[in-house]
Structures are given as C-alpha cells and as structure tokens.
C-alpha cells in the first residue's frame, strides 16, 4: 500500500441539487479534513474553454491544455475554506457552465486527464470528496461512501434558491428545470463513469431533510467507525 493510500477518504456522490456541497462543507469542518469539490474542477475547465471560445475537438482541447497549467490553477483553489474569487465563483456557478462541464465529463480522455488532478487532493488527515463518481472511480477504496438522492422538483427549487442567495442572474425555473433534466440524462447515460451509486454506498434521500438533518445522518454513520471521535 502506498503512502497516499493510507489517507482515509469519505465520498459523497449524487446528482446536482441534492445538497452535496453544503453537506461536504459541514462534514469537513467537523472532521477538520481536506475537501475536494470535483464538480468545480470540471466547471473551471469548462469556463476556461468557454472564455477562450474553444470548439469541442480533441485537437483544440489538447492545444488549450498545453497553454495552461490547470494543475497549478486548481491547487490554488482552497476547497476546505472555499477560497475562490467571487467573479470566478459567479462565472463557474452559472448553469450553462455546469452543462458544458457535463459535456466535458462524457469525454474519456478528459476524465483521464482530470483523474490525477482529483486524486492529488488526497492528503492527511483525510479527504471528503464530493462528486458523481468519487466512490465508483476516483476513490474506490474510500472508507465510507454516501450517495445522496432527492425528488427532482425539490432539486430544481433548491438550485433556484441557491442562485438567488448568491446573486447569480440565471434563476429561471423553467430553464434550470430543463438544464438539470438534460444534465441528469447525460450523467446517467454516459458510457464512462455514469452517475450510479457504488455497490457499497449508503443511500440517503434528502428530499424532506434540512442541511442539518442530512449532515447529522452522515455524521452518525461516520462516528460508528471507532477511529472517529468528535
């Protein structure tokens, strides 16, 4: 076993709007662990592609990768304390960037390219990894794997509320409904790393639960492991 693999990982997977990011932040604060928001990595890459008006082709994307140091850029984002410029955060939070990120996630060599970037966040004392394939592909040896689900309309409403609170000017219910539906279909049906629970994942339905309730449920499972004492 390598030194890196001695670092414990807890994964939280699920579709958008189920509360992964918020729960991830609560759990990481309780455990004082590092955080990986894998969706942000795809969104940052999607924003760079959008900003540079790069067409979707292997040649164009490869040229872009050679001209940017994505690894260094990603490492400068402190997920644990959510340190990221407000302008960049607002840009990558837009739903159209999320959809572009979802399209990128369907490209095999993009996923392979970003696999190392994601695994590089595995550092002591531990890592809370949030995404769509954290427990199935990126960290299959995670000590605990959670998969959050929620009613679709509840997820859309949560996303609208999130945008309103953050002052993001793309809070159109019908558009968000359509975009999330499209993204769900793409995430579930892609051939590479589809959005599915790991075989040993713990499924949590957050439809009628508050952030505090969901966080407490996850923490109760975590605390059952003797090594964790808060």
Curated annotation (Swiss-Prot):
EC number annotated for this UniProt entry: 2.7.4.25
Organism: Buchnera aphidicola subsp. Baizongia pistaciae (strain Bp)
Main location: cytoplasm
Gene3D superfamilies assigned: P-loop containing nucleotide triphosphate hydrolases
NCBIfam families listed in its UniProt record: cmk
Protein's UniProt keywords contain Thylakoid: no
Protein family: Belongs to the cytidylate kinase family. Type 1 subfamily.
Residues annotated to bind ATP: 14-22
Catalytic activity: CMP + ATP = CDP + ADP; dCMP + ATP = dCDP + ADP
Enzyme class: transferase
InterPro entries (alphabetical): Cytidylate_kin, Cytidylate_kinase_dom, P-loop_NTPase
GO molecular function: ATP binding; CMP kinase activity; dCMP kinase activity
Gene that specifies this protein: cmk
Lineage, highest ranks first: Bacteria, Pseudomonadati, Pseudomonadota, Gammaproteobacteria, Enterobacterales
Compartment(s): Cytoplasm
GO cellular component: cytoplasm
Keywords: ATP-binding, Cytoplasm, Kinase, Nucleotide-binding, Transferase
GO BP annotations listed: pyrimidine nucleotide metabolic process
Pfam families xrefs: Cytidylate_kin
Protein name: Cytidylate kinase
């Amino acid at each position: 076993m390598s030194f890196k693999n001695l670092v414990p990982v807890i994964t939280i997977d699920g579709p958008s709007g189920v509360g992964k990011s918020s729960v991830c932040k609560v759990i990481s604060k309780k455990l004082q662990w590092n955080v990986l928001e894998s969706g942000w990595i795809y969104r940052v890459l999607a924003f760079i592609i959008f900003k540079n008006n790069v067409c979707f082709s292997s040649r164009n994307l490869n040229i872009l990768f050679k001209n940017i140091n994505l690894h260094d850029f990603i490492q400068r984002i402190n997920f644990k304390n959510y340190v990221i410029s407000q302008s960049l955060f607002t840009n990558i939070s837009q739903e159209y960037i999320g959809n572009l990120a979802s399209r990128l996630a369907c490209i095999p060599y993009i996923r392979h390219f970003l696999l190392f970037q994601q695994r590089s966040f595995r550092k002591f004392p531990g890592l809370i990894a949030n995404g769509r394939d954290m427990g199935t592909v990126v960290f299959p040896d995670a000590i605990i794997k959670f998969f959050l689900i929620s009613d679709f309309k509840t997820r859309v409403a949560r996303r609208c509320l999130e945008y309103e609170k953050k002052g993001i000017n793309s809070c159109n219910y019908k558009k968000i409904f359509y975009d999330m539906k499209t993204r769900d279909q793409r995430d579930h049906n892609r051939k590479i790393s589809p959005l599915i629970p790991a075989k040993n994942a713990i499924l949590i339905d957050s439809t009628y639960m508050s952030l505090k309730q969901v966080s407490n449920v996850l923490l109760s499972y975590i605390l059952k492991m003797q090594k964790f004492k808060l």
